[in-house]
Structure formats: C-alpha cells, structure tokens
Amino acid sequence: MTLVQVMAQDDRDQVVLRTADRTEIADTLRPFGIQLDRWPLRELPADAGQDAVLAAYRAEVDEVCRAGGYRFVDVVRLVPAPEDPEWPARAAAARGRFLDEHRHTEHEVRFFVEGRGCFYLHLGDKVYALVCEAGDLVSVPAGTTHWFDMGAQPHFCAIRFFEREDGWIGDFTGSPIASTMPTLDELVG
C-alpha cells in the first residue's frame, strides 16, 4: 500500500499525517516538487531481467526520459534468496548503502515494478516517509535531503532514471536523523 507518514524531525511519535489516499499524498508532496504517479503494471516472469523489464515499460520509460532529459536507465532487483547463504549479508549491505541521509545533484526518479520501499524526505522541520509499492513512479528533486529503506528482507524491482552514467552519487549530510525514524518494516507492520 502506498502511504505517507509525516513526522516531526525531532520526535518520530509526533505524527502530523498518515494517509494512504493517493490524492492527499500527491497534494502533500507537490509543494516540495515531489511527484508521485501511477503506471499500470505489466505481467512479467518473477525472474525478468533488465531487458524484459525495460521492454515491458518501453513507452513509459521513453516518455520519462524525453520529458526529464534522462539518458541512462537501469533496473535494480533485490529479492529474497533463502537458498543463498550470502543473501543476508548482501541484503544488509545493500540496505545500509542508502540508509543515511543524503542528497543528489540530479533528480532521483524510480518506478517500482514489484515490491516496495520507503523514501524518507527531510523537508523543513518534518520527515515525510513515503512508502512506494509496485506501480508507483516517484520523482524527488535534486538537492532534497532524503534516505531510502528497502526493509530488513528487501523485495523490490525498480527502474532507475539518470541524467549521467554516474548519476547515483550521494552527498551525505552526516546527520543521524535516519536512525531516529521508524523503519519501513515498522511503518507497514
């Protein structure tokens, strides 16, 4: 379920808003330049690779690239692999890479093909936890301080859009705020 929970930056228990209403979510985020759209989902095999995923969403991907000036697109997939003894360590490392507050010099645009993840947007004196699910397209403006949680058992596939080949370069703030907020798992229980 797509939802937003807005909390005071210094008190995670001071919840100003929690809603799964898509119109209310979009209206809440729009003043900050954050866009949330929805694409229809396509039938894909569980192990669909990058080429198959991009082919299934070719028209939408081309439109986002044209409108936003994105020249590089890739697909990232992280799904549980209980038969792989390395899986827990790989999942923890992947999760840890994005859990600290940072910003980028370009927009962060993601389409969730499957699964879910949470963008935490530090805007003014509040944190907006935006849980995205399959079908959600989110665009976070360049310079927005944020972090991302994929959960303790990551399960998602996302199409990522970049202006430059090295587009995901985080400028980390050094703030410990991410460690004071509820995790994705806590938000969705």
From Swiss-Prot:
| One of the record's GO molecular function terms | iron ion binding
Q: Which GO terms describe its biological process?
A: L-methionine salvage from methylthioadenosine; L-methionine salvage from S-adenosylmethionine
Q: Which residues bind Ni(2+)?
A: H102, H104, E108, H146
User: Which residue positions does UniProt flag as site: May play a role in metal incorporation in vivo?
Assistant: E101
The record's catalysed reaction(s) read: 1,2-dihydroxy-5-(methylsulfanyl)pent-1-en-3-one + O2 = 3-(methylsulfanyl)propanoate + CO + formate + 2 H(+); 1,2-dihydroxy-5-(methylsulfanyl)pent-1-en-3-one + O2 = 4-methylsulfanyl-2-oxobutanoate + formate + 2 H(+)
Can you tell me which residues bind Fe(2+)? Answer: H102, H104, E108, H146
The pathway that the record names for this protein is: Amino-acid biosynthesis; L-methionine biosynthesis via salvage pathway; L-methionine from S-methyl-5-thio-alpha-D-ribose 1-phosphate: step 5/6
Q: Which cofactor does it need?
A: Fe(2+); Ni(2+)
Task: Please name the Pfam families in this protein's record.
Answer: ARD
- Family annotation (Gene3D superfamilies): Jelly Rolls
The record's listing under CDD domains reads: cupin_ARD (cd02232)
Q: Where is this site: Important to generate the dianion?
A: R110
Cofactor-binding details, from the entry: Binds 1 Fe(2+) cation per monomer. Binds 1 nickel ion per monomer.
Q: Does the keyword Oxidoreductase apply?
A: yes
**Alphabetic keyword roster:** Amino-acid biosynthesis, Dioxygenase, Iron, Metal-binding, Methionine biosynthesis, Nickel, Oxidoreductase
The superkingdom of the source organism is Bacteria
Could you say which EC number(s) this protein's record lists?
Answer: 1.13.11.54, 1.13.11.53
Q: What does this protein do?
A: Catalyzes 2 different reactions between oxygen and the acireductone 1,2-dihydroxy-3-keto-5-methylthiopentene (DHK-MTPene) depending upon the metal bound in the active site. Fe-containing acireductone dioxygenase (Fe-ARD) produces formate and 2-keto-4-methylthiobutyrate (KMTB), the alpha-ketoacid precursor of methionine in the methionine recycle pathway. Ni-containing acireductone dioxygenase (Ni-ARD) produces methylthiopropionate, carbon monoxide and formate, and does not lie on the methionine recycle pathway.
Subunit and partners: Monomer.
Into which family does the record put it?
Belongs to the acireductone dioxygenase (ARD) family.
Q: Under what name is this protein listed? A: Acireductone dioxygenase 1
Q: What lineage does the source organism belong to?
A: Bacteria, Bacillati, Actinomycetota, Actinomycetes, Mycobacteriales
What gene name is listed for this protein?
A: mtnD1
